[in-house]
């Protein structure tokens, strides 16, 4: 099937594909066996509608996507006659228009489309589970958490648009930027609101942050890419036309020009796309995704991510501090967290991009990148006992097209702690991979989101959860979950962090324990049929969170102390706990965030079109690893 002829999950006829996807969605329950979709044939059809293969007439590069210099959709969304937050006007029929002919009485009613009916049933099922969440009995801790989450809501022009990062009364005079609405911080709050059936605040957030995407942003006279989403925004009141008695509210975004280190938030746009899909799936409001300004926003984000550069790998090249770990921690290059979110955002965008002549090249670029990225991460980032032993025996300085040690990794890079730490059964995706460098630290968010998005294979996903279970005292201990393990210490800490006083060993981003990761751990456990692990982690967190006043993070190797600079009443700690509880009680709702494996995606290798003796694809040699 030619790549240009692919249908994606959009309205009209392609809506059948969306319904097929719904039918193929995993039904979650307490048993892992219940996670298998019953309609395998329908699921396969949906995957075919969602994936591309390269026909023989395509170029070896798959007609690589080139971001347009001028986007007419962009111009339309910014025109004064069509403000970004207004839906396109609906053309009314003229008075003299001929009305449609009435159906003759006695004729049988047209048959209902079974696929569309199934799609509607799926949506009704999700809404029924939302009602179940709303009616469930809440514990004392949950009631307190909802009260605190409600107090954190930020309003703009009379409508709720987000939640502040923290609402700690003890630091009222030293708020820094904790009184702002962060995109990444709001995601667990948005999930909590959606699971509770309160979607308006999420819709407002999506649209207002979309408006901010078009703002001019400069740092020392230099402007980053047009599609960059802000890290955060703040609602400010300013005098109206110099009148000290009249004020108007404005949104003041921060694109990184005020952040510590002046780093652009690479993950903001990725989270925005993931949240947009979740909102549509649980509310059924797909009209939001179809708006011209929203479609333009998606394309601009993808333009930044899919632009050609000097990199030889399908992974995104970013600088230190461009994601949740927003301080210098040695993650510059191709950090796993960004790659997992990137893969998930591409999967979500592929469902939402409108299919037309102007989007064919973009859709091809998405599919090629998904195919290459999944292979790259699964093949080169995965380590278990067998892989570590293989690296231990690597030969170096191999100059050939069929080298085994492709990245010239020196066996001496294997840290001394790893051989004794990694269990016999289990493994994980390493934190980073570059020429002559592997970061063997375990990063929780990247590994968990690799499970959620199906970036990791089924076997790898099981191995990651097996490792967490085997190393419970290291990763969970007294408070879930370690943001990374182990911490940088001694000379390594001084060199890599620059002697950062906030990232001392086993504190903050350097091995601190972050309760907000609980909701992502719960999602991963639900997907893999391991709700028992999520329940254990939630029980550990419940013992302390309310009593400790909902801290941002915990310190020490086992997470016993509240972080030395931790804010209390941290919103994403509160929201992460609430989302975890609701997801665990109604695991069917996890489908709004989870992406199932698409096996046909693995066949979309661009280099299969024009192979030569000089360029050989590594996929055949690694096929068993990828498809497991």
From Swiss-Prot:
Residues 79-90 have a biased composition (Low complexity). Optimum pH is 7.0-8.0. The keyword Mitochondrion applies. Its EC number is 3.2.1.26. It comes from the Eukaryota. One of its GO terms (molecular function) is endo-alpha-N-acetylgalactosaminidase activity. Expressed in roots, leaf and stems. InterPro entries: 6-hairpin_glycosidase_sf, 6hp_glycosidase-like_sf, Glyco_hydro_100. Residues 79-113 are annotated as: Disordered. One of its GO terms (biological process) is sucrose catabolic process. Keywords: Carbohydrate metabolism, Glycosidase, Hydrolase, Mitochondrion, Transit peptide. Residues 1-35 form a transit peptide. One of its GO terms (cellular component) is mitochondrion. The keyword Mitochondrion applies. It is found in: Mitochondrion. It catalyses: Hydrolysis of terminal non-reducing beta-D-fructofuranoside residues in beta-D-fructofuranosides. Mitochondrial invertase that cleaves sucrose into glucose and fructose. Belongs to the glycosyl hydrolase 100 family. This is Neutral/alkaline invertase 1, mitochondrial.
